[in-house]
Swiss-Prot record:
GO cellular component, one term: small ribosomal subunit
Database matches in PROSITE patterns: RIBOSOMAL_S4 (PS00632), S4 (PS50889)
Name of the molecule in the record: Small ribosomal subunit protein uS4
Source species of the chain: Ureaplasma parvum serovar 3 (strain ATCC 700970)
Gene: rpsD
Annotated transmembrane regions: none
GO molecular function, one term: rRNA binding
Function per UniProt: One of the primary rRNA binding proteins, it binds directly to 16S rRNA where it nucleates assembly of the body of the 30S subunit.
Gene Ontology biological process terms in this record: ribosomal small subunit biogenesis; translation
Database matches in InterPro entries: Ribosomal_uS4, Ribosomal_uS4_bac-type, Ribosomal_uS4_CS, Ribosomal_uS4_N, S4_RNA-bd, S4_RNA-bd_sf
Pfam families hit by this protein: Ribosomal_S4 (PF00163), S4 (PF01479)
Subunit structure: Part of the 30S ribosomal subunit. Contacts protein S5. The interaction surface between S4 and S5 is involved in control of translational fidelity.
Protein family: Belongs to the universal ribosomal protein uS4 family.
Keyword annotations of the record: Ribonucleoprotein, Ribosomal protein, RNA-binding, rRNA-binding
Domain S4 RNA-binding span(s) in chain numbering: 94-157
Length: 202
């Protein structure tokens, strides 16, 4: 399964979940705030399998992953001590593209992924252009000096997440101070269903 590159608005409405994390897709000014298609406004009772699938898709589309990438990260979470459901979310948030977004350096996760892909990002003062790279606690994340003039970056004024320490606001330097707690992550995801899904397959 390839990574989804279609309309975020349509996918958010279908899942009933804001992939932009700001509910912009469901604003009352939008033409439609329900799922796309002829029967998009009908409520359907999902089976346990259907619920697992929806919750897995929420995380896959939120973090811009395909199934192979998600399985790999699930195995990483499985190998860590602690609660598997929280481990999974923490691993997802430890991806470089996610941290660039959480640091407030990009307006969306997609934009953050593009910044990493185009070699605008440094981790511990070394260029890293792999969005899926996992960043360890204590590592610094920064944008290259020449990248600071890019309009997308200059116009992004998002506040960093609480688990990100902003070292230099002007030069766009931050540090992953700690792993996030569950209450700092998307509330409208039931990650227990995702664990059930992969426990059944692996």
């Amino acid at each position: 399964m390839s990574r989804y590159t279609g309309s975020i608005y349509k996918k958010s409405r279908r899942l009933g979940f804001s992939l932009l994390e700001n509910n912009k897709e469901f604003n009352s000014g939008k033409k439609r705030t329900y799922g796309p298609g002829q029967h998009g406004n009908k409520k359907v009772k999902l089976s346990n399998y259907g619920q697992q699938l929806v919750e897995k898709q929420k995380l896959m589309f939120l973090y811009g992953l395909n199934d192979r990438q998600f399985r790999r990260l699930y195995r990483v979470a499985l190998g860590r001590p602690g609660v598997l459901t929280l481990n999974l979310l923490q691993v997802l948030e430890s991806r470089l593209d996610s941290l660039v977004y959480r640091a407030g350096f990009a307006p969306t996760r997609r934009a953050a992924r593009q910044l990493v892909n185009h070699s605008h990002v440094l981790v511990n003062n070394k260029k890293v252009n792999i969005p899926s790279a996992l960043v360890e606690v204590g590592s610094t994340i920064a944008l290259k000096a020449k990248s600071l003039e890019i309009p997308l970056i200059k116009n992004t004024l998002n506040k960093p997440a609480d688990f990100i320490e902003l070292i230099d606001k002007e030069k766009k330097v931050a540090k992953l101070a700690r792993l996030p707690e569950r209450n700092e992550l998307p509330a409208d995801v039931n990650e227990a269903y995702v664990v059930e899904w992969y426990n059944r397959l692996m």
